[in-house]
Amino acid sequence: MKLDLKILDARMRDYLPAYATTGSAGLDLRACLDAPVTLQPGETTLVPTGLAIHLADPGYAALILPRSGLGHKHGIVLGNLVGLIDSDYQGQLMVSTWNRGQTEFVLNPFERLAQLVIVPVVQAQFNIVDEFTESDRGEGGFGSTGRH
């Protein structure tokens, strides 16, 4: 799949999104910063990537997801948990960055911050009904199938 990528900050030409390994599902996104940013515990900031994409095809969307090492080792996760990039969005990719850890975290310019995953999308249409055809599960939810 080929995507249209617009470089909004010329410095990002050296830091294009890339798969870290041949089996990677996510493309690494980097922080397009002029100087280091310090996030205090509990603080959230919006970090630019210096890049924009246009998927164009409504059969696809992109997800911005956290990098597992930053979350596990430093408590750095996404403030909105998952960023959803619609196929018709053409603005800069931004990363809502939240320090849920107990210590301050310094984010350096061009550091890998998040990952971008392209996913297929089905746009559903609704069929209005008065009743559902009964299933084995019915309305059971929130633990109704047990833990083991």
From Swiss-Prot:
It catalyses: dUTP + H2O = dUMP + diphosphate + H(+). Its cofactor is Mg(2+). It holds the Pfam family dUTPase. Its EC number is 3.6.1.23. InterPro entries: dUTPase (IPR008181), dUTPase-like (IPR029054), dUTPase-like_sf (IPR036157), dUTPase_trimeric (IPR033704). Keywords: Hydrolase, Magnesium, Metal-binding, Nucleotide metabolism. Substrate binds at R67, S68, G69, N80, L84, I85, D86, M94. GO terms for biological process: dUMP biosynthetic process; dUTP catabolic process. Pathway: Pyrimidine metabolism; dUMP biosynthesis; dUMP from dCTP (dUTP route): step 2/2. Signal peptide: none annotated. GO terms for molecular function: dUTP diphosphatase activity; magnesium ion binding. This enzyme is involved in nucleotide metabolism: it produces dUMP, the immediate precursor of thymidine nucleotides and it decreases the intracellular concentration of dUTP so that uracil cannot be incorporated into DNA. Belongs to the dUTPase family. This is Deoxyuridine 5'-triphosphate nucleotidohydrolase. It comes from Burkholderia cenocepacia (strain ATCC BAA-245 / DSM 16553 / LMG 16656 / NCTC 13227 / J2315 / CF5610) (Burkholderia cepacia (strain J2315)). The gene is dut.
